């Protein structure tokens, strides 16, 4: 699996996977990008946009007509204007990265003929209207909102459609199953149809009061007889001599208990004696023998139901209504009237129950009007119904496209479930749909069919960014529609333009609200590249229209068989959100209906092909799917007789010819984070969950190092997350420095585009989590790169591979109790060599506002501050870049005017003599908060429009303009070089018919001739070849345009820089200061491996005290072996052994590299590499210099890839250990660093990839001397953010009581907490140097007294000796 890429040649991973991967892994952030592109459709031509996304929203809301119908506002098209600021400018200025939306609307005014009412068009006006800004997505699938990066998480919700379910016997004490159906639209009213305990069928609309389902059918326009004929077959019983001739049907009579003998109506023979039960088998035998009909007596027909009204044709008298039960009385009438045929309903109480018939007879409503009134009263209680209003309301509930939308998904699901064939453009319900739902529900009650599993992924779908945004924008437009309608009626429609009717605020507000405060719009987790990718691939069941934590039961959270290959069964948070927030599996994608699909290889006649098909959960249920690790022969046929397959949620062995599909890869069932854990298959699931979650918390280290033991996914993550920069086009590196890479393109040379790609690198930027984003180039000038090659590493990436931690030498052994309970013992080398050192960038900002008493000022001139404290500030009062600051230092000097206090005459005199002194301002400077110390890396100054810039702001601006000018000049130089070299190639060797001054006509143009003239004059040369001249002319035109474009872009950017900034109201100036903090690892920091093996650093030990190996190498980390057996994450042990082998092989390679350097012989290096890698294509293609560089890169350790579920086996690890010349047990003799004696037993030693997590002790440790108090109780606040105190709770009080420490206890509950007067006295006593104090009444006691008084209980305090004690009021 060698990648022939620029970085792939510098470090080759040995690949242990056996299964070839056929499917390309989709781009990992495609979910976000594709969805939003489909919503905006920026690149689609404005005329031919399909009806989806934003286009669909406008189409659904427009046209808008006024109330009288005299005018109409139509939507024509929309387009986006270019965004005002680019991504980086938005980040810096705290703006939203958005593009203005311009919509073309057409206002049509009609003339209405008063007599005929005919409409004719009187006037048409078209105009472009601004409809607010729509946020744009960045290249990496995020949004910049108010300067911060946010991610819109996709939401899992119940798919629209129809669902059948039962109450699992919980409602009724007998445990009887009550079935229910629910029709869920995308938007609109829900319709529930349910059975009650008496088997009557009811309907509910929007969870309101229930009504009999027959009332709903009446409202749909059916009458009683039609209802019965819809749900029941009609049987005609004929009158014969001894009774009735009844048609015989085996299915209908199975399970029939006979009262009298069963007699064949045609022959008169007895076919079954009385008192016996007709079994299914007997019934079938009778039918096969030719039994056509049975003879039954009158009494055997009692209890059946009439199928249609029995009416006397002459008089019109009704003897019996449809659905009436047959009684003796009715028989008398029938016999009197001489009925020969009797139509009965086919209800046998076994296969067909009388539920609808019973509901009909229980229903009080008899007509459509009654039913409509009843529904109206349920929906709008308290309003008197009229027939029109009731009809209109019922119509609008389910049949009006404006209010009810099943969506294409809902329609498709409904068609599948009910076996209908309505087109997916039919978005409202139809009469047939409702009847089909009731029919299916009744069938379920009769024991036919299955209920739905609502946790099946075929019944849950994903709403991605585009769709969430679409719904939000629709809400905004609907709010706008009301306002437009009212305005159309109130203005003179003939004189207005569309612009005057529209106020875009509601639409813009809906968008802003969604991005700013929706539960699904989240602050991006930017700790490292993996956490970014995982955040974008997250699926949440929470959010508006989703579940809530409290209500979600166990079933929703559980892993479902349909999750296979779609949703990761491992990666989900621990705690209350477990199972509600999931991650998309590696190969999964979301289809156009919002269902998650996973790829499979097609199997034809027992042979696996390379054709890849994506299937959703519903489709997959129909097929048999084999695992990816089933053994195949060279032709792709199954080698085993039985293949284990998944089919309809079960695992069954099948013969190869029955298999339909096969998995594409073993890692398709896990998410990206879980696929990064080597030997995942050897870890317990709970620990794998912790492992995949903790990788997302790994802090980017100062020196990233890719893992020795990887899984082959590292490169994919680094590339797709956008942390590492990939080349957009193939080309040659032209220029390079720390902040940018300039590549001259050699492919995709479009004459309309620049031939130069400039890649700007991010240097020491702050991420959302305050970690450091820093990119560094990997290429040198003159390197040839292909499209897609990695040219720069980002945070946590190393040679284009994800590198979250470091490879460290670990020994598994106890060490003086310092690794008790998962603690971690570290060597001092780790601190000294900055192995786990990370840089964190803190941002501090200060604003100078305009206050009532005058403007605040940012200045160096601060009252009562020593010159020493100002040493880091420049003349503008802002700290220098590069200054070292610590807690309490001033970053930005600021003074605020304070209110005039009355002055004494002496003060007035002094004031008059010495002029205005600083007594009327107070110091409100920005200082470094406690616990922070570091170096200033960046300062940004923002000024309001029209406010004069200070010296510092001007200096920053000058620097920025210089940078822009350099970019422009470089691009210009490369452009010139490119164009003039192409021009010289074109002219070289041609016959010149004219040229610049001094050129002789008809002379041959050569390079030498060209060099005599300045390049700008080369355009004057002309040749007789017209085609050539046309090409040159086109090139010149393109060149001039490019030049102009470059200059224009430069001027635009400079203009933006010099223009003032948009600051919040009342703010005159804002300064942001960025402090870089270097955090070395220290006791209290949390570390973890990739297998959920986490712990806290307990002690850092001098190198010489650490256990060491026979060759004198000291261990870097000592872990407790007891952390492995009970946790069952054996993967870490296998990783240790394999890492040990990698390091050993690295040493071997280092020796051969040294041999090459001393003897110039490359053979030993080639042979060693061949022994390790076998026949590797990449290594074969390298020249000697490249081999040497590869050797250098491999000398610390040979990186290997062991993919999940398809990785190295035990035998492979032993073989690697042998190859490295190590003991195959993976254990070594270890010596005690303090005594030098060997330990009794051999110890497992090897390399593990350890991460430093974001839970750093520096961020958590905190101490308070004095600080803020809570307003009511006057107790200190809590928490580091509030600079709070430590809570002395109930149990701590018990502890002091138990020890009888009365005075300590009193002090804790009074002066150290909320005895206001006592606190002040203690302070005064300390100032005097006195150490006595007296405790008073705690403020919380006064609060209690007040509460009791509010309940009407007066409380007075009395001191037993001195009478009433003063309470707080008395004191006041």
Swiss-Prot record:
GO cellular component term of the entry, any: DNA-directed RNA polymerase complex
Reactions listed under catalytic activity:
RNA(n) + a ribonucleoside 5'-triphosphate = RNA(n+1) + diphosphate
User: Per its UniProt record, what Pfam families does this chain match?
Assistant: RNA_pol_Rpb2_1, RNA_pol_Rpb2_2, RNA_pol_Rpb2_3, RNA_pol_Rpb2_45, RNA_pol_Rpb2_6, RNA_pol_Rpb2_7
CDD domains in the cross-refs? RNA_pol_B_RPB2
What is this enzyme's class at the first EC digit?
transferase
Molecular function (Gene Ontology), one example: ribonucleoside binding
Q: An example of a Gene Ontology BP annotation on this entry?
A: DNA-templated transcription
Oligomeric state and interaction partners are given as: The RNAP catalytic core consists of 2 alpha, 1 beta, 1 beta' and 1 omega subunit. When a sigma factor is associated with the core the holoenzyme is formed, which can initiate transcription.
Q: Give the family per the record.
A: Belongs to the RNA polymerase beta chain family.
List, alphabetically, the HAMAP family matched. RNApol_bact_RpoB
Name this polypeptide is given: DNA-directed RNA polymerase subunit beta
Q: What gene, per UniProt, encodes this protein?
A: rpoB
């Amino acid at each position: 699996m060698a990648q022939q890429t620029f970085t792939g040649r510098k470090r080759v991973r040995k690949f242990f996977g056996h299964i070839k991967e056929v499917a390309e892994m989709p781009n990992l952030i495609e979910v976000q990008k594709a969805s939003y592109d489909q919503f905006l459709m920026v690149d689609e031509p404005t005329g031919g946009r399909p009806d989806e996304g934003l286009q669909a929203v406008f189409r659904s809301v427009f046209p808008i007509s006024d109330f009288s119908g005299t005018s109409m506002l139509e939507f024509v098209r929309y387009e986006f204007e270019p965004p005002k600021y680019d991504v980086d400018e938005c980040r810096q200025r705290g703006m939203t990265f958005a593009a203005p939306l311009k919509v073309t609307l057409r206002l049509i005014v009609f003339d209405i003929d008063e007599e005929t009412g005919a409409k004719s068009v009187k006037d048409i006006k078209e105009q472009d209207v601004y409809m607010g800004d729509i946020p744009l997505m960045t290249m990496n699938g995020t949004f910049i909102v108010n300067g911060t990066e946010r991610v819109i998480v996709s939401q899992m919700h119940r798919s629209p459609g129809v669902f059948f379910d039962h109450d699992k016997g919980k409602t009724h004490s007998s445990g009887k199953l009550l079935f229910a159906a629910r029709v869920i639209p995308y938007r609109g009213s829900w319709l529930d149809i349910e059975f009650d305990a008496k088997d009557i069928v009811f309907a509910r609309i929007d969870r309101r009061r229930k009504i009999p389902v027959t009332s709903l059918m009446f409202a749909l326009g059916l009458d009683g007889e039609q209802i019965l004929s819809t749900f029941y077959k009609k049987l005609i019983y004929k009158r014969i001599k001894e009774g009735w001739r009844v048609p015989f049907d085996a299915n209908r009579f199975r399970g029939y208990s006979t009262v009298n003998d069963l007699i064949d109506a045609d022959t008169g023979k007895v076919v079954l004696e009385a008192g016996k039960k007709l079994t299914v088998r007997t019934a079938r035998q009778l039918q096969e023998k030719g039994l056509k009909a049975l003879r039954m007596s009158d009494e055997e027909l009692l209890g059946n139901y009439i199928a249609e009204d029995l009416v006397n044709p002459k008089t019109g008298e009704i003897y019996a209504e449809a659905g009436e039960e047959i009684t003796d009385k009715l028989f008398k009438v029938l016999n009197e009237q001489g009925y020969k045929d009797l139509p009965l309903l086919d209800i046998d109480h076994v296969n067909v129950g009388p539920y609808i018939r019973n509901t009909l007879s229980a229903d009080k409503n008899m007509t459509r009007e009654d039913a409509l009134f009843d529904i109206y009263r349920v929906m709008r209680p308290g309003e008197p119904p009229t027939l029109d209003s009731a009809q209109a309301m019922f119509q609008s509930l389910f049949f009006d496209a404006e209010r009810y939308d099943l969506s294409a998904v809902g329609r498709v699901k409904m068609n599948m479930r009910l076996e209908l064939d309505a087109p997916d453009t039919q978005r409202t319900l139809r009469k047939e749909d409702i009847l089909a739902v009731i029919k299916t529900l009744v069938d379920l009650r009769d024991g036919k069919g299955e209920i739905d599993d609502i946790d099946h992924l075929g019944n849950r779908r994903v709403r991605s960014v585009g769709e969430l945004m679409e719904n939000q924008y629709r809400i905004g437009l609907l709010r706008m529609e009301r306002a437009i309608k009212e305005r159309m009626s109130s203005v003179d429609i003939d004189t207005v333009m569309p612009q005057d009717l529209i106020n875009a605020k509601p639409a813009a507000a809906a968008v802003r609200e969604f991005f700013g405060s929706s539960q699904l719009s989240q602050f991006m987790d930017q700790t490292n590249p993996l956490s970014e990718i995982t955040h974008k691939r997250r699926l949440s069941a929470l959010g508006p229209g989703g579940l809530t934590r409290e209500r979600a039961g166990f079933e929703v959270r559980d892993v479902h068989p349909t999750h296979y290959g779609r949703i990761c069964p491992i990666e989900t948070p621990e705690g209350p959100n477990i199972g509600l927030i999931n991650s998309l599996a590696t190969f999964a994608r979301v289809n156009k209906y919002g269902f998650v699909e996973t790829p499979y290889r097609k199997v034809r006649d027992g042979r696996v092909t390379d054709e890849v098909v994506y299937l959703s959960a519903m489709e997959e249920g129909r097929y048999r799917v084999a695992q990816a690790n089933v053994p195949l022969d060279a032709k792709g046929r199954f080698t085993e007789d039985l293949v284990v397959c998944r089919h309809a949620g079960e695992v069954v062995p099948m013969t190869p010819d029955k298999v339909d599909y096969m998995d594409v890869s073993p890692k398709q069932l896990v998410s990206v984070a879980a696929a990064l854990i080597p030997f995942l298959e050897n870890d317990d699931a709970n620990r794998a969950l912790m492992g995949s979650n903790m990788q997302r918390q790994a802090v980017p280290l100062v020196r990233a190092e890719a893992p020795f033991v990887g899984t082959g996914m590292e490169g994919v993550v680094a590339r797709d997350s956008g942390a590492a920069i990939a080349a957009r086009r193939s080309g040659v590196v032209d220029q390079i420095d720390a902040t940018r890479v300039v590549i001259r393109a050699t492919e995709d040379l479009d004459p309309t585009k620049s031939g130069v790609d400039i890649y700007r690198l991010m240097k020491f930027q702050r991420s959302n989590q305050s970690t450091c984003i820093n990119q560094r180039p990997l290429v040198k000038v003159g390197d040839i790169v292909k499209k897609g090659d990695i040219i720069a590493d980002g945070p946590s990436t190393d040679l284009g591979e994800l590198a979250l931690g470091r490879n460290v030498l670990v020994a598994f052994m106890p060490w003086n109790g310092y690794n008790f309970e998962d603690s971690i013992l570290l060597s001092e080398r780790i601190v000294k060599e900055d192995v786990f050192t990370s840089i964190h960038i803190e941002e501090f900002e200060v604003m100078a506002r305009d206050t009532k008493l005058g403007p605040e000022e940012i200045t160096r001139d601060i009252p009562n501050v020593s010159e020493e404290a100002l040493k880091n500030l420049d003349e503008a009062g802002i700290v220098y870049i590069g200054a070292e600051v610590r807690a309490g230092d001033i970053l930005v000097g600021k003074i605020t005017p304070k209110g005039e206090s009355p002055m004494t005459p002496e003060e007035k005199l002094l004031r008059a003599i010495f002029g205005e002194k600083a007594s009327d301002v107070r110091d409100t400077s920005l200082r470094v908060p406690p616990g922070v110390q570091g170096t200033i890396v960046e300062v940004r100054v923002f000024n309001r429009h029209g406010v004069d810039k200070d010296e510092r702001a001007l200096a920053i601006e000058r620097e920025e303009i210089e940078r822009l000018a350099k970019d422009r000049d470089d691009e210009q130089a490369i452009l010139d070089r490119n164009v003039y070299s192409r021009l010289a190639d074109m002219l070289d060797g041609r016959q010149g018919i004219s040229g610049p001054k001094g050129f002789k006509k008809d002379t041959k143009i050569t390079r030498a001739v060209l060099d005599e003239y300045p390049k700008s004059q080369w355009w004057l040369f002309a040749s007789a070849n017209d085609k050539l001249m046309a090409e040159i002319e086109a090139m010149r035109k393109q060149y001039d345009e490019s030049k102009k474009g470059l200059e224009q872009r430069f001027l635009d950017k400079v203009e933006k820089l010099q223009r003032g900034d948009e600051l919040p109201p009342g703010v005159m100036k804002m300064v942001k200061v960025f402090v870089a903090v270097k955090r070395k690892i220290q006791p209290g920091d949390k570390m973890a491996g990739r297998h959920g093996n986490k712990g806290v650093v307990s002690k850092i030990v001098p190198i010489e005290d650490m256990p060491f190996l026979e060759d004198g190498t000291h261990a870097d980390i000592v872990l407790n072996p007891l952390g492995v057996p009970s946790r069952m994450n054996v993967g870490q042990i296998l990783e240790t052994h394999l890492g040990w082998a990698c390091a050993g092989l690295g040493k071997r390679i280092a020796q051969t590299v040294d041999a090459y350097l001393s003897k110039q012989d490359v053979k030993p290096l080639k042979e060693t590499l061949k022994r390790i890698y076998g026949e590797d294509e990449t290594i074969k293609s390298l020249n000697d210099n490249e081999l040497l560089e590869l050797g250098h890169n491999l000398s610390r350790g040979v990186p290997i890839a062991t993919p999940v579920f398809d990785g190295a086996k035990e035998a492979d690890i032993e073989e690697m250990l042998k190859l490295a010349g190590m003991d195959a047990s993976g254990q070594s003799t270890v010596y005690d660093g303090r005594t030098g004696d060997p330990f009794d037993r051999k110890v497992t030693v090897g390399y593990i990839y350890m991460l430093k997590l974001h839970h750093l002790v520096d961020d958590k440790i905190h101490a308070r001397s004095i600080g803020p108090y809570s307003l009511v109780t006057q107790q200190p606040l809590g928490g580091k953010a509030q600079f709070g105190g430590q809570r002395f709770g109930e149990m701590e009080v018990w502890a002091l009581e138990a020890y009888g420490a009365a005075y300590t206890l009193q002090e804790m509950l009074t002066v150290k907490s909320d005895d206001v007067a006592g606190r002040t006295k203690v302070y005064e006593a300390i100032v005097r140097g006195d150490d006595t104090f007296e405790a008073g009444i705690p403020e919380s006691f006064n609060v209690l007294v007040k509460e009791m008084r509010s309940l009407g209980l007066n409380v007075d305090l009395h001191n037993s000796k001195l009478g009433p004690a003063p309470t707080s009021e008395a004191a006041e």
